[in-house]
């Protein structure tokens, strides 16, 4: 069994994979929660028991993290409870070991682990396509791939971050829970914030896709991440929504680093559910 960690700015997602890469179970921990390697192990162990998983069967740990100040907890967890040195998803690990991502020569080195695993996953899905990846997280990121070369990208605030920015920097605007607006004509403060942020995001994403298409007219646009499924319904330029792209990419990173002889593995066949929406094909790889 392989244990992956997808550490984002909002949530930490532990992922239990079998040797073929099928996801056995996942759960979420708030990133801001204070914990040590001991409390983390207790959470993992209790969850594994609830899913009838034997935690002693974990043979490797892969960590994709965009929160460096908590990485040490996961290093200590691996060493103390599993006698494993966790492998972190980094650009050096990709470039030096598996050669799956080439960086455009003039680009500064700063590609985060979350974007690396997204790229590895889409390159596995569509090795021959020009690809634009849109990941709807705390920030919404755009990454352009052509001929296995990372060409660049951009970052805009995500929906939750936009709501928090309004609340934190104004005296009278409330902090609200985001809900999909029924109309752009908000009738109170909360509905107006929802409408403005939602349709503002839709509009900015459409415009950014348009700008990328000027340089890469054949780009195939893939969306992923929390709010991505709903927003994708409003953006006809998005070709496909893949809900677990990061989790797929973490195992692909493991496979390329540790299982090179197993060129494909069973796992990538996944469990596929196809839905028709906006005349495009949507994929749910793992039915958990």
Where are these regions (language model features)?
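Gly/Thr-rich phosphate-binding beta-strand-loop-beta motif of the actin/hexokinase/Hsp70
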Residues: 1-24, 128-147, 166
């Amino acid at each position: 069994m392989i244990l992956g960690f997808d550490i984002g700015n909002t949530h930490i997602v532990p992922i239990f994979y079998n040797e073929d890469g099928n996801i056995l179970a996942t759960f979420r921990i708030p990133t801001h929660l204070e914990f040590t390697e001991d409390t983390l192990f207790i959470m993992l162990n209790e969850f594994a028991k609830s899913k009838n998983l034997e935690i002693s069967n974990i043979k490797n740990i892969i960590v994709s993290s965009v929160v460096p100040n908590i990485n040490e907890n996961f290093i200590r967890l691996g060493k103390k409870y599993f006698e494993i040195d966790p492998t972190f998803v980094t650009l050096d690990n990709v470039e030096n070991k598996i050669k799956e991502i080439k960086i455009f020569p003039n680009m500064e080195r700063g590609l985060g682990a979350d974007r690396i695993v997204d790229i590895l996953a889409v390159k596995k899905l569509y090795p021959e396509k020009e690809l634009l990846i849109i990941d709807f997280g705390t920030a919404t990121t755009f990454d352009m791939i052509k001929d296995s070369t990372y060409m660049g990208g951009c970052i805009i605030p995500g929906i939750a971050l936009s709501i928090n920015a309004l609340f934190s920097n104004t005296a009278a605007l409330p902090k609200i829970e985001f809900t999909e607006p029924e109309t752009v004509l908000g009738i109170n403060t909360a509905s107006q914030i929802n409408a403005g942020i939602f349709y503002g995001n839709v509009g900015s994403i459409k415009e950014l896709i348009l700008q990328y298409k000027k340089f890469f007219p054949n780009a195939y646009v893939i969306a992923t991440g929390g709010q991505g499924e709903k927003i994708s319904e409003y953006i006809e330029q998005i070709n496909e929504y893949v809900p677990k792209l990061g989790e797929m990419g973490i195992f692909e990173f493991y496979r390329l680093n540790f299982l090179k002889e197993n060129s494909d593995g069973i796992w990538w066949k996944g469990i596929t559910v196809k839905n028709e929406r906006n005349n495009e094909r949507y994929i749910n790889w793992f039915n958990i």
